[in-house]
Amino acid sequence: MKASEPVRDLVMIHGAWQGSWAWAALIPKLEAAGFRCHAVDMPGNGHDRTRPEDVSMAIYMAYLRGVLDGIGGPVIVIGHSSGGIIASQLGEEEAKRVKSILYIAGMMLLSGMKFAELVADFSKNDPAALGIVPYLAWSRDRETSTVKPGAARKIFYQDCSNPKANAAAKLLRPHPERGRDIAARLTKGRFGRIPRAFIEARLDQSVLHKMQRRMQKLVPGAHRYSIDSGHAPQLAQPDALAKIIGRAIAGLLD
C-alpha cells in the first residue's frame, strides 16, 4: 500500500458470548463506505476447537497476528465491549500495523487492570453496574458462563426490535472465563502512541455510561463520540454507527 492511501481494513473484535455474527448488520454499511471488514471469531467462542481452559491472551494474540498476516497491510482495530481489552493488547504487540483503535462501548483500561475491578468499584453504590453478571449461568467447572435469552434482551439488546433482540440472544454462546478475566499489558511507547476513538453507548445497561466515562479518564487521549443506544449499537443502529465510525476514522487518520 502506498503511504498516501488511506487505511481501509477494519479488524472487528467481538465481545464476550458473541461471535463475528455480531457485526452482520453493520458490515454492509461500512463496506458501502469503502471499508474492508474482517470480523473475527475469537478462539474458544465455539467456532473452533480451542478448549475453554486453554484460552489466554497469548492465544488471542497468536490468532489475531494470523489475521493481520492475511490482510498484509496496516489496519484499524475495532473492539466492542470486552473486545476492547483485546484490541488494546493487539495495538501494543502490533503497533506498526495497527494504525488506530476504535472502542465501541469498549473496555479501555489501564495496563494490568481488569474490568472486574471497575465493576467492583461502581457496584458498591450502584448495583446496576454489575451489568450482566447477576444473570450469568455457569458450567459445573466454572470454566464457561452463559447468558440466557431473557437476560440478553434486558441487558444487551433492550433498544433493539423484538425480532433483532430475539435472534441475537439465540446466537450467544458459552464464553470461556479465562477469556473474560483478562487484562492488557500496555506501554506508552507502543499502545500509547496509537490514535484512539471511544464511541459511547449512552443507554448501555451492560457497561454503564458513567463507567465508559471513567475508562476515558483512566486512559485519556481518545477522541469521544456518542450514540443514544444500548450495549449493541451495531445491531440497534447500524446506519448511525457506521457514520460515526467513518467520522472517527477520518479524524484519527488526518
Predicted segment positions?
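Conserved HGGG/HGGXW glycine-rich cap/lid loop of the alpha/beta-hydrolase fold
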Residues: 5-49, 72
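Conserved alpha/beta-hydrolase "nucleophile elbow" surrounding the catalytic nucleophile
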Residues: 14-16, 75-84, 201
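Active-site loop/oxyanion-hole signature of alpha/beta-hydrolase fold enzymes
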Residues: 36, 42-78, 89-93, 116-121
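Flexible "cap/lid" loop of the alpha/beta hydrolase fold
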Residues: 92, 96-98, 102-140, 179-180
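Conserved serine/cysteine hydrolase catalytic core
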Residues: 170-234, 238
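Post-His helix in hydrolase/transferase enzymes
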Residues: 235-249
